[in-house]
A protein has these predicted regions:
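Proteins synthesized as precursors that undergo proteolytic processing into mature forms
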Residues: 1-108
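In a subset of proteins, long, contiguous C-terminal domains/tails are tracked
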Residues: 89-146
Length: 146
C-alpha cells in the first residue's frame, strides 16, 4: 500500500456535519462504497422528509454498484439497483420499466450501510437543547441522547 496520486483509498470514511441555523446533525456510516449513498438517504430523510433520526436510519434503502468497487476484486455491475424488500412492489416495477435492473435485498440488509446520527436541536426555549439520535438496525449500533 502507498499514498500516491491515482491510487484507490484504503479506507472510505466519510463523517459529516450538517449545520443549519441553531440545528446541528453529525452522522457517519461504515459500508465501503455504500457509505455516501446511505448517508445521503439518511440526510434527506431527516432534512427533506422530516423523519426523526431513528426513523431516518431505519428507512428502506437503495444502493448501486455501477462504478468499479473500491475493494478487490473491484466489482461493478452497471445498471443494477439493489432495493430493500420494504420498497413497495409498484416502485420496483416502475424502476424496471425505466430500465433499471432491480435486485431485491432482504429488509435491513447489512450491505446497505449502517448510519448513525445525532441531531442537536433547539427546544421550546432558547436555553434548552434536545439531543436526538438514530442507530441503524442493519449493524450493531446504539444511540444515546439526553
Amino acid at each position: 500500500a502507498c499514498l500516491q496520486a491515482g491510487k484507490r483509498p484504503r479506507l472510505t470514511p466519510a463523517p459529516a456535519l450538517a449545520l443549519k441555523g441553531e440545528g446541528v446533525m453529525a452522522f457517519g456510516c461504515p459500508g465501503g462504497d455504500v457509505i455516501v449513498q446511505a448517508m445521503l438517504q439518511a440526510f434527506l430523510n431527516v432534512v427533506h422528509f422530516e423523519m426523526s433520526p431513528q426513523q431516518a436510519t431505519e428507512a428502506a434503502r437503495v444502493a448501486t454498484f455501477a462504478f468499479p468497487g473500491s475493494f478487490f476484486p473491484n466489482v461493478h455491475i452497471p445498471g443494477l439497483l439493489n432495493v430493500e424488500a420494504r420498497i413497495p412492489e409498484h416502485v420496483r416495477t416502475e424502476l424496471v420499466a425505466r430500465g433499471h435492473n432491480v435486485r431485491v435485498w432482504p429488509d435491513y440488509e447489512f450491505d446497505a450501510g449502517g448510519v448513525s446520527l445525532v441531531c442537536d436541536l433547539p427546544a421550546h426555549t432558547a436555553q434548552e437543547r434536545v439531543l436526538a439520535a438514530g442507530a441503524d438496525p442493519r449493524r450493531t449500533n446504539y444511540a444515546w441522547g439526553k
